[in-house]
């Protein structure tokens, strides 16, 4: 797959099509970098169109040297607001929408390599309203505190380039968002999450770009340092249990997944986030090995990893 340079747009002339073109370039760059780190497979592309307007490119890597399944989705869709969107956005006038972004989830083969998720997006209404959203979070199957600390440090560095208040604010937002009430546990070690961010379009977009561009170097590093670690059968089984909890969150609590399925979104692209294999064991006891219980003990909101 040919790598394309990320498009740089003069901020004073930026419009929705420029933002969409940037996200396409981000998808290209991330796919090229992650495939190079994996070294065992490449991303296959599935282009699709939406009857109401727009379309996207879903790229999936399967059975790589490190990644069992990885998806990088780009979309740019537009058209009349779905009735559920009208209610959700509390819109009282007849308007159309435009939405574009990149969504990523990666599931590794080795249980010591963490699951990662990224989403960066832009939404615009024909009445002139617009906002950005997104986030990046890490879900280790087995939490390694030193790596959790490193991950959060990288996010803080990016956030601090724009505003020192961003990291604590968006870290708390992620703790609250990536939480499964029915399990009373977080999905993983969190990260940052933000939504409905308006303000100055150019400034917010620069922040969103910085988050998107941090993904590949962060995850490539985590892949490299963990992929060769040996693991036991108990640790592999624990990985499937942790994947099961990931599935529960995505299908039961994730607003984007639920909203997409309820508004005639593209099902294959929406469910790209699910792992190829997961398990649910009745009354599972994580005490079968020390790292299992230690991981569940850290699936809590409000941990100051840094």
Describe each PLM feature range.
Residues 3-4:
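Cationic, low-complexity basic patches in intrinsically disordered or flexible, solvent-exposed regions
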Residues 15, 104-109, 152-235, 239-247, ...:
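Long, histidine/aromatic-enriched segments associated with O2/redox biology
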Residues 16-90, 197-232, 236-246:
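Gly/Pro-rich turn-and-neighbor structural signature
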Residues 58-131:
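Internal mixed beta-strand/loop scaffold within catalytic domains of large alpha/beta enzymes
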Residues 85-87, 203, 258-264, 282:
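Short conserved micro-motifs at the rims of enzyme active sites and ligand-binding pockets
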Residues 118-141, 261-277, 281:
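Intrinsically disordered, low-complexity regulatory segments enriched in Ser/Thr/Pro
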Residues 126-172, 306:
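Compact, glycine/acidic-enriched structural inserts
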Residues 267-306:
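TerminUS-proximal long segments
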